Amino acid sequence: MKRTILFFTFTALVFSLSAQNSVVIKLNEHTKYRGYNTMEAFQKRRSVNIYETRDLSLQDLSDLLWAANGINRPENGKKTAPSAMNSQDVDIYVSRADGTYFYNAITNDLVLVTTEDLRPLMDGNRPLGTPVILLLVSDMSRYKNYSPGNAERNKHFFEMGAIDAGIVSQNISLFCAANDLGTRPRASMNQVALRKALNLKESQVMWLNHPVGYPK
């Protein structure tokens, strides 16, 4: 009995310390009306290579993430980006100078994953100097019939994850075009180092990254 009490006391202490040490950035409520209209956004859409170095404002970052894959129907938890079978398999990691964060659409905040700036692992030999890089990761385990370690059976989920990530990527591109922000979708990145730094599971696939900033 004493061992059981000690175990739960220790577990609660560890959980408490972990919660105290966690860093969370609360995002703003998204802006309902802003930017150019849809057809103007399509007209302005382009891949940007030259950026200013100043940070994104909290409102711009909040609106960007909501547009990318935020919850637009709170009554059922559905998102701005559709996903196969409503799996909601795509997660967004936000890498900045002060660390890399996980975007939690449910609580509308950023949760620190690592204090390491992982942007160089996505910039490679062609750094753009953007204040933010968004990493799109599909978690195949959210599909109902996902089978761990069974590559052949999971092939369809792998393909659907790629499509779902592409939809989120398009949301990012169109939001940026509509709001005078710059971005470009990229597939190149140091996947081995990123997987280790973010402690990703086997079921999680990194598909694309988006540098985002104010174009010069």
Task: For the regions a language model picked out, list residue spans one by one.
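Bacterial Sec-dependent N-terminal signal peptides
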Residues: 1-22
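Small-aliphatic-rich amphipathic alpha-helix that forms the alpha element of a beta-alpha
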Residues: 45, 64, 92, 132-143, ...
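Core catalytic architecture of nucleotide-activated donor-dependent transferases building glycoconjugates
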Residues: 109, 148-149
